[in-house]
């Protein structure tokens, strides 16, 4: 198994909630509403949405902001949810007894939720330099590979034959 090395980001903080007893589809329905929003706006949305999955996600977003303010000293007003993902966890399988000696299977699904908050005050400090770097870039240039030909000046005789 190949593991990718994660670059340490000095502007992001995360909170991970594992084995939350909720379907991944129901959690994604809520997560899609808050992805890319500011911290305060996400809390307001989560408080007003009528779904059962909002409360564990609310606790995770609040925990990620507490990690940001305590561990790295970020202000909560500058935080934005840069990444929010829901992955499938284990499924707990039980048998419920029924009439005449039969049983009925019950599947209880769980999910893992990751919330990543990013501090945008770092980007606002260097916003004035974006205009400077914009002028350095050539208009119409792209990063595509272009066919470059290398001319050999020594074998052509044009440079060294003249004395």
Curated annotation (Swiss-Prot):
Transmembrane segments: none
GO biological process: translation
Record InterPro entries: Ribosomal_uL22, Ribosomal_uL22_bac/chlpt-type, Ribosomal_uL22_bac/org-type, Ribosomal_uL22_CS, Ribosomal_uL22_sf
Main localization of the protein described in the UniProt heading: plastid
CDD domains: Ribosomal_L22 (cd00336)
Description of how the protein assembles with itself and partners: Part of the 50S ribosomal subunit.
Name recorded for this polypeptide: Large ribosomal subunit protein uL22c
Source organism per UniProt: Lobularia maritima
Underlying gene: rpl22
């Amino acid at each position: 198994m190949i593991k990718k090395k994660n670059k340490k980001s000095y502007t992001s903080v995360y909170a991970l909630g594992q084995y939350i007893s909720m379907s991944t589809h129901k959690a994604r329905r809520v997560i899609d509403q808050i992805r890319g929003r500011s911290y305060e706006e996400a809390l307001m949305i989560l408080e007003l949405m009528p779904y059962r999955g909002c409360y564990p996600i609310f606790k995770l977003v609040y925990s990620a902001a507490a990690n940001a303010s305590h561990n790295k000293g970020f202000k909560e007003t500058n935080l934005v949810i840069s990444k929010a993902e829901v992955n499938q966890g284990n499924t707990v399988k039980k048998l419920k007894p029924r009439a005449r000696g039969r049983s009925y299977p019950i599947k209880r699904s769980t999910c893992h939720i990751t919330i990543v908050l990013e501090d945008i005050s770092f980007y606002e400090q260097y916003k004035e330099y974006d205009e400077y770097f914009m002028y350095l870039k050539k208009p119409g240039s792209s990063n595509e590979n272009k066919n470059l030909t290398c001319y050999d000046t020594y074998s052509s005789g044009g440079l060294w034959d003249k004395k």
